[in-house]
Amino acid sequence: MSDLKTESQDLQQEENTLIALRKEKLAAEREKGQAFPNDFRRDSYCNDLQKQYVDKTKEELEAAAIPVKVAGRIMLNRGSFMVIQDMTGRIQVYVNRKTLPEETLAAVKTWDLGDIIAAEGTLARSGKGDLYVEMTNVRLLTKSLRPLPDKHHGLTDTEQRYRQRYVDLMVNEETRHTFRVRSQVISHIRKFLIDRDFLEVETPMLQTIPGGAAAKPFETHHNALDMAMFLRIAPELYLKRLVVGGFEKVFEINRNFRNEGVSTRHNPEFTMLEFYQAYADYRDNMDLTEELFRELAQLVLGSTDVPYGDKVFHFGEPFVRLSVFDSILKYNPELTAADLQDVDRARDIAKKAGAKVLGHEGLGKLQVMIFEELVEHKLEQPHFITEYPFEVSPLARRNDDNPAVTDRFELFIGGREIANAYSELNDAEDQAERFLAQVAEKDAGDDEAMHYDADFVRALEYGMPPTAGEGIGIDRLVMLLTNSPSIRDVILFPHMRPQA
């Protein structure tokens, strides 16, 4: 342990020495004049040049003498050649000691890895076939005071990668790729819905009554109004108010906040897509979701087969559709339908499975507890799990044939919930009764039970058309498409405990 501590202290001392040297160099730049100039305008990106001129030979480039202006961070320094990196990729720049002024050559010798430079020159190709910029002018734009991670080991400490994402992005192409994919996914989802006549909207992040999901909220205080407010746990009730108002197809991509545990699948602040369409039901949403997921896989991976860890999920095949009840029996053949239909036996099964049983739960709630403990983690390939009991679905429409369950599904892939959807409850009186039942659950000790929202009931009293709604966790979806093991890998700045 003491050896590790000594090594850490030595590394810290070495870093402090390097920082001090860089600060001396910055002081020298300040003496010359403006140390952080902002008058350079590039006309090209590094990787765009690599793609555009990939077929040009050394002789063709020499004859064309194509002028370019590039800028980026120095990632490698090989003496005469430096490698710079911008948002698109990398390119080499050549320090020609025969043509560059002595003053410039002297300045180049003082530059360090991590410094940001501007380079002007013409494109050329090396004997090895590498494209580079033969510089006619180069200057320092930003002095980096902290050294980059060691080039051989990189930034490998996972926690440091999350805490210092800016460094992670500089040195890890895999990280940059993940967040480019995330942006691509969100952009395509937006286009997918807009092309189908959905209207993008924004609803309150600060709410007086947290609703739309079973979760524990973050509470804050509005000083001017002297009242408690909550960061939203879901936008659902506001989006359905918009459907009542006549916006029949709406969606929102935004943040939700839940004051709950942190894990590889949970972050207190996360991104959700929620969409609602009138004159549709939950089966329409299943079809729409399959279509969307296939398009996203094809867009990102060029295939509907999605590799994740040591598994491959097949988005090109029809997603399995099973009820909660049937899935328990399928994946637990030792159980019988009679076991699940008797409240005392179901309670015993839930307890033995490890569920937190309080004792007041109804049969439907116990069935869901059994499902969560004994089935959920087994759902590897895409599964739509349907017909959730109404006790755990206070906002969903009851099934016409079996009023004990609702027209609802959750989508599971790799044992994780990715989406939740249902045919919306639009009976104002039924909704009021279910809110009252949720209040009773909360009074009995269920912190995640919903509050009574009188204004939402009033909105339903004006009449909401038959509607289907859905929420999709963007972070978990991006995890799948980028083969990322932790939700922190797909959130730029995940929540972390403060460093000691």
Curated annotation (Swiss-Prot):
Full protein name: Lysine--tRNA ligase
One Gene Ontology biological process: lysyl-tRNA aminoacylation
UniProt-listed Enzyme Commission number(s): 6.1.1.6
EC class: ligase
Complex formation: Homodimer.
One function term, GO molecular function aspect: tRNA binding
UniProt keyword annotation of Nuclease present: no
Catalytic activities: tRNA(Lys) + L-lysine + ATP = L-lysyl-tRNA(Lys) + AMP + diphosphate
Record keywords, A-Z: Aminoacyl-tRNA synthetase, ATP-binding, Cytoplasm, Ligase, Magnesium, Metal-binding, Nucleotide-binding, Protein biosynthesis
Location within or outside the cell: Cytoplasm
GO cellular component: cytosol
Domain of life assignment: Bacteria
Pfam family, one: tRNA-synt_2
Family recorded in the similarity comment: Belongs to the class-II aminoacyl-tRNA synthetase family.
Gene: lysS
UniProt-annotated binding residues for Mg(2+) 1: 410, 417
CDD domains: LysRS_core, LysRS_N
Stored PANTHER family: LYSINE--TRNA LIGASE, CHLOROPLASTIC_MITOCHONDRIAL (PTHR42918:SF15), LYSYL-TRNA SYNTHETASE (PTHR42918)
InterPro entries per record: Aa-tRNA-synt_II, aa-tRNA-synth_II, aa-tRNA-synth_II/BPL/LPL, Lys-tRNA-ligase_II, Lys-tRNA-ligase_II_N, Lys-tRNA-synth_II_C, NA-bd_OB-fold, NA-bd_OB_tRNA
Signal peptide residue numbers: none
Organism of derivation: Pseudomonas putida (strain W619)
